[in-house]
């Protein structure tokens, strides 16, 4: 088992918490992390690019001149690709760039980035984040008490809406529920702050 410090909301230490070594103590695999980040970034692409082919360009229904007898090359439409203002041939069309990796690869990538955060001592566990009202100032004070000042990913239990609202206006802070934990967000953050209930949810899914 891997052990890390457990903090209270006020920043004081509240003992240690044992982490599942099968999740937080694996040998980080950079290759699967790279492949997973590529997959996630590809899925973020809108893919709405499009051009007009000759059938989509307005006009061009009438043959510009008769087929024979003019001495000019035969033409059937002023919207053919060789004409200025004509349609585009083999241009981009709307498409989805998303694809899926095998589940075992995705799970290994998630375990790898979590284990790397533990190795880098950038993994902070808090026993809970409870607020009476969604106050940004109070959430910022909690992070300051935890000595977290860099780009941070905060992972909350799925039903902690108040804390999520309290952090949404903070720069360099991203809040996600435990069920939304992903490789790209973890790798992009300098610090990962997770509540103990959220940690239990993550271990339940990945164990």
Curated annotation (Swiss-Prot):
This is Large ribosomal subunit protein uL4. Part of the 50S ribosomal subunit. Belongs to the universal ribosomal protein uL4 family. One of its GO terms (biological process) is translation. Keywords: Ribonucleoprotein, Ribosomal protein, RNA-binding, rRNA-binding. It comes from the Bacteria. Disulfide bonds: none annotated. The lineage of its organism: Bacteria, Bacillati, Bacillota, Bacilli, Lactobacillales. One of the primary rRNA binding proteins, this protein initially binds near the 5'-end of the 23S rRNA. It is important during the early stages of 50S assembly. It makes multiple contacts with different domains of the 23S rRNA in the assembled 50S subunit and ribosome. Forms part of the polypeptide exit tunnel. One of its GO terms (cellular component) is ribosome. The keyword Cytoplasm does not apply. The keyword Nucleotide-binding does not apply.
